[in-house]
Amino acid sequence: MSKELIEEGYTTWPRLIAELLKNKRTKDKIEQVAVGDELMTWRKALKHPAFTKWFYEGFGGADGCKFTAWSKEWVYFPVQYDGHESVGRVPRNPCAVSTEHFGGG
């Protein structure tokens, strides 16, 4: 079933985070995730129904749940531009890394 959903433009937050980590060529490990008002481990988040729910990532409304995820070096969060959903990240601690604009442009 997941192959058909992927072909139709559906995804989950864990899939989008994994794609981002692959594209950045990092072995970053997510330690904690807040889904709604619950803080949990990554392992528990992978079983949370809202976090693992399939949603349409294409243009339209924001369908994925709100979340914040932390690794040792980065903070991950949902990004939406014109209805398209993706994952953004910023450094967890102060450093000399500037943040690009999120969204369009």
Give the ranges of each region predicted by the language model.
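N-terminal domain-onset segments
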Residues: 1-55
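Generic marker of "main functional regions" within proteins
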Residues: 30, 40, 78-80, 85-86
